[in-house]
Amino acid sequence: MVYRRRRRSSTGATYGLTRRRRSSAGITRRRRSSGYRRRPGRPRTYRRSRSRSLTSRRSYRTRYY
C-alpha cells in the first residue's frame, strides 16, 4: 500500500514537472520568436499568428464539446 502510494506520488510529480518544463520552454521560445519579429517592426505578422492560433484552439475546443 505504501509502495503504491509512493509510486503514484512519484508519477504525479514527474508528470507535473515534465508538463511545467515543457510549458515554460514553449513560452520562452515563443516569446523569443515574438521579440525577434517585433523588433524589425512587423507587429502584423505576430498579431496574425496569434489570432490564427487562438482561432484554431477555439475551434478545437468547440469541436471537443
From Swiss-Prot:
Disulfide bonds: none annotated. Residues 18-51 have a biased composition (Basic residues). Probably phosphorylated in infected cells. Residues 5-34 are annotated as: 3 X 6 AA repeats of R-R-R-R-S-S. The keyword ATP-binding does not apply. It is found in: Virion. Its main location: virion. Keywords: DNA-binding, Late protein, Phosphoprotein, Repeat, Viral nucleoprotein, Virion. This is DNA-binding protein. It comes from Bombyx mori nuclear polyhedrosis virus (BmNPV). The lineage of its organism: Viruses, Viruses incertae sedis, Naldaviricetes, Lefavirales, Baculoviridae.
